[in-house]
Each structure stands twice: as C-alpha cells, then as structure tokens.
Amino acid sequence: MADHDIHIIGGGLAGSEAAWQLAEAGYHVRLSEMRGGGDMTPAHQGDGLAEMVCSNSFRSDDGDSNAVGLLHREMRALGSIIMREADATKVPAGSALAVDRDLFSGGVTRALSEHPNITIVRERIDKLPTEGLTIVATGPLTAASLAESIGAATGKDALAFFDAIAPIVYRDSIDMDIAWMASRWDRVGPIGDGRDYINCPLDKDQYYAFVQGLLDGEKTEFKDWEKDTPYFEGCMPIEVMAERGVETLRFGPMKGVGLDNPRTGRWPYAVVQLRQDNALGTLWNMVGFQTKLKHAEQVRLFRTIPGLEKAEFARLGGLHRNSFIRSPELLDRQLRLKSAPHIRFAGQITGCEGYVESAAIGLVAARFAAAELGGRALPPPPPETALGALLCHITGGADASSYQPMNVNFGLFPPLADDVRKKDRKLGYTQRAGKALAEWMTVAAGVAA
C-alpha cells in the first residue's frame, strides 16, 4: 500500500502550493522534485522549492483595480502558502508585491519540509504514473523524459515559447550621483515610501544610441528546431521589442513619464529602472530588461547606461525554452487529463503564465484533488472570480488551436452589465468577484466537512 494519498511531481510554485493545500486538508503528500537529486534545469540556480527564476515580482498587489492583485486577495483568503511567504519576505516595490527570492524560497521550503503530512523526495520522474492520484506541476522546464511520456499519453507534442531572464546588478556599483530613487508619480506602496526604484536617465542621443546597440548586439543563436518557437509577450527580450520600432522601448519599459529627475526637475527622455531584489537591498534587477544578448555584449552595452558605467552584475540575462500542453483540448474542468483522469496538471505547464497564476492553478488543482480523495465533488470556482476566470481560460475558454500562455486579466472575466461606467469597471469586477468567492468558499467548506 502506498505511503501517501497523492503524488505531486514538481516543487515549483504550483507544486508547492498544491502540496500545502492537500497537507492542510489532512492528506499525505509525496512531493517529487528533481533539483537536489542530481538534476537541474537550464534556468534554476538552486534546489529550493518555489524558486523564482525570471523575476522577483508578483506584479500589482492592488486587489480593487487589478486582476492579478485580485488573484492575490483570493489566494490569501484560501490559505495560500505562496502568498503567506510572499507577504513575509516582501521588499519595497511601489504598488507591486516583490520578494527577496532566497528568503521566499527558503520560507516555502521550510514550511513544507516541517509539515508532518508532506514527504519531499529529491528524484526525477521519467514517466507518468499509471495509477494513483497525481498532480503534474513540473513547470515549463519539464525533464525531457517526462515530456515524452506526457506526449505519449496525450497524443500531442508539447507546445513551446521562449522566456527570458533580466540581469541583476550589485547596488554598490550603481552611481547614485547620476541615478536617483523614485517610484512613478511618487506612488507609495504597502511597505515603500514612494522612492522604491533606482532610475537611470537617458537623454535623446543616449537613448537612440542604446537602441542601436541593442539592434547591433551579438545575440544567442537558436538551434534549428527552436527557430519557429514564439516569445511570450509578457516576457519579451528587450532587443526584440527594439526591433519593433525605435520608439517602442520609450513607451514601454524605458518610459520616463511620472519620474521627476531631481537634478533637472523634468522627466527624462527615457529611463532604465531597477527594482530591489533582496531584503538586504544589495541586489537590484533591471526592470523589463529580459534579454538574449550574449553575456559579454550585455556587460558592454548596459555599462553605457548613465549610472551603470561601473555596474557589476550578480547575474546576466538569459533565454530558455518553455513547454506547455494544449490544456483546453486535453484537460477537463477539474484539471484532469481526459485520457487518464487520475492525473491532474497544474501550473505553467498548463499554459497559464506568471508566478501567481501558476501557484493559483496549483491551489485549485489541490482543492479538486482533496474533494476527490474525500469522495466528494467540488464545483469549479465561479468564472466571476480571478481563480475561476483563469481556470476557464485553461480548460476551455481559449481556442485550443491557437492556445498560448496568458496572464490573468479582466478580459477573461464575464462582462459586467452594460450600465457600468468605464471608469467603474475594474472596481465592478473586483467587487463582484469578492461576492462570488465568498459564496464558493461556503460551498467548498460544505464539501470538505
């Protein structure tokens, strides 16, 4: 007889959240994670659970007017370990929720390691289990052997996209006689003071020279089988954005609007922002600067940015290929694989995009599995909630033939009544979601009883 009630494969944000939810519901979990067992992915740097690779940001924490902030709120209400540890390890980031990555991963790892209902096994799983309840949360960097097994079980090749990583700079190597601290419009966040970002200003000539440098810079070459792989729009390499037009960056990650340079009293023509990456404030990441430039080229070009002339880099940018399944075609509304319903999928492998979204789907998958283990059925969260809207997109709301990774956004929610004014719509979505979640939680409590 198995020593566990359910097997979770993958110790990223989705798998960690799923393990916590099931353990808290009283079920024994076997959590398999290949990192720390002799294997590593192309993007991870350590073996901690819930390691954040591309960014330290959970994006906006505004639950009244932002869809991802609403998702934060819903997950907190449902006892999310990911949100608990994010709140415990947050660093100043304006109205966004950003964390110290190492403290965050350490907190999640410690919580799961100490839970009496969770057994963490450092092992690589090469094939989908043929029996026993399972949640596959291996993320976009699933081991090739398991990816082949998934393809065989689904009859479908995995879909893929490219994801990019932004560089991290040592704080003491930034020239603060040129750069300055400020948040856009001096916005004060939950733990900040309206001065949460380091801003490096560029004038018109410097900006155009920088863009030309991006276009001319030597870039990572793709293998033949990678050349038709698209980029994810939400994590686009900065040089690819520059290829879309010389002004693209100035109206994107390098926009100077709302940032008064204290030395000129004016907004800069363009700006490079850096966000605190750890609690000590010693590491800062370049916001929106995901890149596939070769490392030597990154150092040369980024040191042409005013204030970063002597920058020392703790990590340079990079590119990795992410895989996901065609979820709307392959999964039912309970995230079960239609061809093998003892298996659920969760996290980024389902085609949701973003750390929070990944953890949210892990949470929902675990709730469904807990109900099934108890011999009951839990209805999906209503589509009016952020959890439900994201779930609907993954399990049928999207066109399976053109399915691509998606962040949570209000476009996934059912429309509001026509008489709601445009300026009131975001609050309308979030208020409606709050009522719908409360009703669903009442139903869920009855199912768990």
Curated annotation (Swiss-Prot):
State which Enzyme Commission number(s) the record gives. 2.1.1.74
What is the protein name stated in its UniProt record? Methylenetetrahydrofolate--tRNA-(uracil-5-)-methyltransferase TrmFO
Q: Name one GO cellular component term.
A: cytosol
Q: Identify the main location.
A: cytoplasm
Q: Name one GO biological process term.
A: tRNA wobble uridine modification
Query: Sorted alphabetically, which keywords does the UniProt record give?
Result: Cytoplasm, FAD, Flavoprotein, Methyltransferase, NAD, NADP, Transferase, tRNA processing
In its UniProt record, a GO molecular function of this protein is: tRNA (uracil(54)-C5)-methyltransferase activity, 5,10-methylenetetrahydrofolate-dependent
In which residues is FAD bound? 10-15
